[in-house]
Amino acid sequence: MARYVFITGGVVSSLGKGIAAAALAALLQARGYRVRIRKLDPYLNVDPGTISPYQHGEVFVTDDGAETDLDLGHYERFTGRPANQQDNITTGRIYRNIIEKERRGDYLGATVQVIPHVTDEIKNFVLEGNEDYDFVLCEIGGTVGDIEAMPFLEAIRQLGNELPRGTAVYIHLTLMPYIPAAGELKTKPTQHSVKELRSIGIAPDILLVRADREIPESERRKLSLFCNVRESAVIQALDVATIYDVPIAYHKEGLDSEVLSAFGIDPAPKPRMDRWEEVSHRLHNPEGEVTIAVVGKYTGLKDAYKSLIEALHHGGLANKVKVNLDWIEAQVFESEDPAPYLEKVHGILVPGGFGERGAEGKILAAKFARERKVPYFGICFGMQMACIEAARNLVGIEDASSSEFGPTREPVVGLMTEWLKGNMLEKRAAAGDLGGTMRLGAYEAVLKPDSKIAQIYGSTDIHERHRHRYEVNIDYKDRLEAAGLNFAGMSPDGVLPETVEYADHPWFIGVQYHPELKSRPFEPHPLFASFIEAAIEQSRLV
């Protein structure tokens, strides 16, 4: 039978509940346990697919096509377990399910209410499909006290009573701020947060306390006394240099031991931390460094590129170098010469995005990389802009553009109206809904055996995750290839271009999919490892 760990947050948002959940899962895995992590998001959107990246950050896509919270990316990277549609739920999805049931008459005329119908739907989500796991970690989004989170907190309170005794543990993540004028850390915000949680009916078993400096023993005793938890269960969560230091830091503080003790597991299996120690060693002892320019649209909020950032660092791990990121807003190149920004970097990456803003700047970045022989990695939108650049400057199609930007006589990039998903034909219309209507999830691609990208993968058959509505127009394939842009990867039916590259360029690859979503610290994605390797070579030339 699975044991359940419920992780809540208090005082302020963005404390790192997702990282805490992922780190704890990694520690339990290191002891040989099978672990699943689930995220419960209180917002009313059905999923984050249509939320602005500036508000929500990255949309993480799973193999089965779910558009989910970016925390699921942390879960995958820390545990290696692929997430799926059933690992993320939102208030919007819960209400949609309930309304559909009510319309069908499933409630037999009952008045549909938050309690029991909404809370029951949440509990069903938490409990479903956990037969193969020893531990299920549930992160509750938001902060204790938020009105949106109340049904979720009530649901996990009920589960604490309904689950067999000793199979549910509550962890509360809080902040202990340092007040410079007083010269001390303050416990009062944590005390009030726990008081709020207890008023709902949840008594935390463990306090995970974020702080920017060591918490004195006297303050831990104070928290233990006023929050009614064991002193050993007041765990300090100090700031660390990288997120990959968190599992080791939490293990040293005894978080995993305290969780197992709360479940009555004694003696517990000893953890094997060698993998995490190796990653930490490589991160803190690089043998060199490279600089990658990320020419994007949402550079003001790095969370919009969370998986991309981590995948680049994984590429650095594979090559034992530090990867420095130079963030450049693509619009800058529409009014300024790209050369001063790009001459000293060792690689250029143009990530995914939507809309016309910044597109011309990304096209100019691709042009600079092609002409100056600088390693270029175009992902999704970045591949599309590279193809438009080639069409304009190599093929001579001056009006080459994307139908995403409006009507055009030369739609080198156009809206996909149909594609195969397994044996099913998926269809879309330009006037259709935005939510959940893209080409989403893992799809197969076939690579040319003699291509650079096939050599990098070591295979001609790959499966990668997609999230896009627009695709390079196959009608332009022959002219682009004649100009030197090789369509090295296609969908199995030969209709959708998946990868492009230049044979006469040291490293210029565009991919329609999102390889960053499948990169792990222990298994860096081969494209990112190869891209950073090419950047190292470029660093010797600059």
Curated annotation (Swiss-Prot):
| Biological process according to GO | 'de novo' CTP biosynthetic process; pyrimidine nucleobase biosynthetic process
The record's annotation in PANTHER family points to: CTP SYNTHASE, CTP SYNTHASE-RELATED
* Keyword line: ATP-binding, Glutamine amidotransferase, Ligase, Magnesium, Metal-binding, Nucleotide-binding, Pyrimidine biosynthesis
| Binding-site residues, ATP | 14-19, 71
Q: Which organism is it from?
A: Brucella canis (strain ATCC 23365 / NCTC 10854 / RM-666)
Q: Known InterPro entries for this protein? A: Class_I_gatase-like, CTP_synthase, CTP_synthase_N, GATASE, GATase1_CTP_Synthase, P-loop_NTPase
Task: Give the catalysed reaction(s), semicolon-separated.
Answer: UTP + L-glutamine + ATP + H2O = CTP + L-glutamate + ADP + phosphate + 2 H(+); L-glutamine + H2O = L-glutamate + NH4(+); UTP + NH4(+) + ATP = CTP + ADP + phosphate + 2 H(+)
Residue stretches in coiled coil: none
Active site residues per record: 380 (nucleophile), 514, 516
Chain sites annotated for binding Mg(2+): 71, 139
- Please give the activity regulation comment for this entry: Allosterically activated by GTP, when glutamine is the substrate; GTP has no effect on the reaction when ammonia is the substrate. The allosteric effector GTP functions by stabilizing the protein conformation that binds the tetrahedral intermediate(s) formed during glutamine hydrolysis. Inhibited by the product CTP, via allosteric rather than competitive inhibition.
Q: What class of enzyme is it?
A: ligase
Protein name (database record)? CTP synthase
